[in-house]
């Protein structure tokens, strides 16, 4: 089934070249199908890149999905044109009276700043309140997960001695037969991480409403969920393209920053050799399981009932 996106969205050409079925909102109106309504709160600076990454994953399932792109109006984006935001994005004010089957809140490169000092955090709190009352299930990614754990459950982040950067092995630490989100997961799977902060396992375990579904011996908890399944927290970046960590590495090198080579990413740990992208199967399974089992099979048919 197709993913419904705004006309002329830059990601369209890339997705079509990858044989991902996309249609415009105008065409979708004439089809007698009730698509899943998904809001993507895109906090990443490279908006088009993140749009493409997420739409690729959402478009790889047999369910029609309609997308609304959301950005914080209280933040001035330096890496995207105002025209792009005006053409393709909405704000929380535009959607405050709507209901959504699902929402994705992305990461943001602000994890070394205190939450309350992030210029759009007050607006993000409004969005997170909205996600509780007007969204059936919300998937939070990296800093988005840390911000939500802080706001909803008073779990603060902790600065790491050095950046977690690379691709890391993870395992399931719960009976995966009882958790639909984990269906089909390998016993060991890989996920990219790129962050300066963490949420400690012991802090999560103090909250009875939360469960840790999967973690890494090297980088800690990875998938955390509320027991009702309506809040999912992902501490890594499964949506990343094969080249994203490489781009981040050379960006920091060119800025004169001290940055270690991303772990378990380049063959022989050598940036001059080919990279190893071994997380795409996991990423597709994670997003399809979330959409199928936590959104599609659970959300009411009528938006009013959400």
Swiss-Prot record:
Its EC number is 2.3.1.31. One of its GO terms (biological process) is L-methionine biosynthetic process from homoserine via O-succinyl-L-homoserine and cystathionine. GO terms for molecular function: homoserine O-acetyltransferase activity; homoserine O-succinyltransferase activity. Substrate binds at residues 163, 194, 251. Pathway: Amino-acid biosynthesis; L-methionine biosynthesis via de novo pathway; O-acetyl-L-homoserine from L-homoserine: step 1/1. The record marks 194 as: Important for substrate specificity. It comes from the Bacteria. Its main location: cytoplasm. The record marks 111 as: Important for acyl-CoA specificity. The active site is at residues 142, 237, 239. It is found in: Cytoplasm. It catalyses: L-homoserine + acetyl-CoA = O-acetyl-L-homoserine + CoA. It is an enzyme of class 2 (transferase). GO terms for cellular component: cytoplasm. PANTHER family: HOMOSERINE O-SUCCINYLTRANSFERASE (PTHR20919:SF0). This is Homoserine O-acetyltransferase. The gene is metAA.
């Amino acid at each position: 089934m197709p993913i419904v996106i705004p006309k002329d969205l830059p990601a369209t050409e890339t997705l079509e070249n990858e044989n991902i079925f996309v249609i415009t909102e105008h065409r979708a109106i004439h089809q007698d199908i009730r698509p899943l309504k998904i809001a993507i709160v895109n906090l990443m600076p490279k908006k088009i890149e993140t749009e493409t990454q997420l739409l690729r994953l959402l478009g790889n399932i047999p369910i029609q999905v309609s997308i609304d792109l959301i950005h914080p109006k209280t933040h001035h984006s330096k890496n995207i044109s105002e025209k792009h935001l005006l053409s393709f994005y909405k704000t929380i004010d535009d959607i405050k009276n709507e209901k959504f089957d699902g929402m994705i809140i992305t990461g943001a490169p602000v994890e070394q700043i205190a939450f309350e000092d992030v210029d759009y955090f007050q607006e993000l709190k409004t969005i997170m309140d909205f996600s509780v009352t007007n969204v059936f299930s919300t998937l939070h990614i990296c800093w988005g997960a840390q911000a939500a754990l802080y706001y909803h459950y008073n779990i603060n982040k902790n600065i790491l001695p050095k950046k977690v950067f690379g691709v890391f092995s993870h395992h399931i630490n719960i009976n995966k037969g009882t958790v639909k989100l984990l269906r089909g997961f390998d016993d060991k799977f890989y996920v990219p991480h790129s962050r300066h902060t963490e949420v400690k396992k012991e802090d999560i375990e103090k909250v009875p409403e939360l469960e840790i579904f999967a973690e890494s011996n090297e980088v800690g908890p990875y998938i955390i969920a509320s027991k009702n399944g309506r809040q999912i927290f992902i501490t890594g970046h499964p949506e990343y393209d094969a080249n994203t960590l490489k781009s981040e590495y050379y960006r920091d090198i060119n800025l004169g920053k001290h940055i270690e080579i991303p772990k378990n990413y380049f063959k022989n740990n050598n940036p001059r050799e080919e990279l190893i992208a071994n997380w795409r199967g996991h990423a597709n399974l994670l997003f399809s399981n979330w959409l199928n089992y936590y959104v599609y099979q659970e959300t009411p048919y009528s938006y009013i009932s959400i």
